[in-house]
């Protein structure tokens, strides 16, 4: 059986972590990495934790040079958060007759906010005989797919609360920017007001996935709240820094209503170095129904 040939598109914190993981696996060969700027022409091993050793070198190339028909079996797309931004890249890969796994948060359930693009991706994949999967720890598993699985033991479901208390420390600069790490409280509030601060991307997708799986029709658009987590001590992670008095995280909630009643609530406080201030991470699925479910996993599943 031939090894699965993989191209990684984007070698930031996420793509680099995927490379390190794949290099531990059997049956998989990384045959290319797509990057940009000064990274092009350099070795993948210059940007990841794994030493090259006696492995063949993998040079970072441009998308124009690397995206050829059937150049790999699958492309891991480790760029973007939003379906509209990921779509042009997905289209290029699919038209080269390669499968796609995307880590873009909205791609976990793209029909929630981009139904037309989701339909177009489905059409392109079928035309080219390949598949497109959007997934991740969250969204993609902890606050949605796991919730759906846990409802499988219920005769009836009345309401759902999914809570994830997690550390942002492993994430790269893009996530630090989206979450407002290191900015002042005034800057955070202004970013929330004018929509330039994204915070967690995925409530629409997670709530949409859970509602569709149960058979609930949302009676109103998903809403969310967003508050700064202000640190009283300096905190530093590999890609972020927040001095005392500034923003070290973002506490967000998402709400899904059915027939005017709150049925799905998501509670998601995230911050860098939570342990530094005594915050214990964890994942929680609380289902009110028959029977009730109270699933706790602490510390969090990292990711």
Where are these regions (language model features)?
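Rossmann-fold NAD(P)-binding glycine/threonine-rich loop
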Residues: 104-130
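C-terminal helical cap and adjacent loop that interface with cofactors, partners, or active-site loops
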Residues: 272-303
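A short hydrophobic/small-residue beta-strand
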Residues: 99-101
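Alpha-helical support elements that line or immediately flank enzyme active sites
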Residues: 141-152
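Aromatic/hydrophobic pocket-lining residues that form π-stacking "cages" and hydrophobic walls in ligand
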Residues: 89, 121, 207
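Gly/Ser/Thr-rich loops at beta-strand to alpha-helix junctions
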Residues: 12-14, 82-83, 107-111, 137-143, ...
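Active-site-lining helix/loop region of Rossmann-like oxidoreductase modules
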Residues: 9, 13, 151-275
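N-terminal glycine-/serine-/threonine-rich beta1-alpha1-beta2 phosphate-ribose binding loop
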Residues: 1-96, 215
